[in-house]
Swiss-Prot record:
UniProt source species: Levilactobacillus brevis (strain ATCC 367 / BCRC 12310 / CIP 105137 / JCM 1170 / LMG 11437 / NCIMB 947 / NCTC 947) (Lactobacillus brevis)
GO molecular function list: ATP-dependent peptidase activity; ATPase binding; serine-type endopeptidase activity
Protein known as: ATP-dependent Clp protease proteolytic subunit
Disulfide bond residue pairs: none
UniProt keyword Hydrolase present: yes
InterPro entries assigned to the protein according to its UniProt record, in alphabetical order: ClpP (IPR001907), ClpP/crotonase-like_dom_sf (IPR029045), ClpP/TepA (IPR023562), ClpP_His_AS (IPR033135), ClpP_Ser_AS (IPR018215)
Active site: 98, 123
Keyword DNA-binding: no
Length: 198
């Protein structure tokens, strides 16, 4: 059961109740938590577009705690992060694994944060295929293209050579917050919200 807390605010016109995510959105904060799939991606994209249209000179903070998920859904979020004019701060808490690690590393350079005990996990995309031989071959080629694309994005984001990414994503590769900074996927470890750049 997914319970969403409600926040009540007082104003001169009385009380107003918000679900917690709507209240955070007022402060330009978006929560990306849980598996990345189409419905979640659509909600994240809509929030990014809304906040950018509202004021493209202010940063958007994207808090990430996700095991990853559907690559096409994640790439839709990635493309939107690059499409909008607002800087997107990424703040990793808990875990940014798989496609979520791509998003965490795709924030505006200098504004990619992780909390001290966050983890980042990079690996090659997974998938399955069944059916006729030609269908399996097509699916295998598609997974190889996807791996190449993801590793290219991670190489650009981290400054690491593509050869290192190919090697380091061969299997699940877990990085602590400090290791993610050293690797170039994250810029800073943030222990206090006052360290966040506005």
């Amino acid at each position: 059961m997914n319970l969403v807390p409600t926040v009540i605010e007082q104003s001169s016109r009385g009380e107003r109740a918000y679900d917690i995510y709507s209240r955070l959105l007022k402060d330009r904060i978006i929560m990306l938590s849980g598996p990345i799939e189409d419905d979640m991606a659509n909600a994240i994209i809509a929030q990014l577009l809304f906040l950018d249209a509202q004021d493209s000179t202010k940063d958007i903070s994207l808090y990430i705690n996700s095991p990853g998920g559907v690559v096409s859904s994640g790439l839709a979020i990635y493309d939107t992060m690059n499409f909008i004019q607002s800087d997107v701060q990424t703040i990793t808490l808990g875990m940014a694994a798989s496609m979520a690690s791509v998003l965490a590393s795709s924030g505006t350079k200098g504004k990619r944060f992780a909390l001290p005990h966050a983890q980042v996990m990079i690996h090659q995309p997974s998938g399955g295929a069944q059916g006729q031989q030609t269908e399996i071959e097509i699916a295998a080629r598609e997974i190889l293209k996807t791996r190449e694309l993801i590793n290219k994005i991670l190489a650009e984001n981290s400054g690491q050579p593509i050869e290192r990414l190919n090697q380091d994503t061969e299997r699940d590769n877990y990085l602590s917050a400090q290791e993610a900074v050293d690797y170039g996927l994250i810029d800073h470890i943030m222990t206090n919200s006052s360290e966040q750049k506005k």
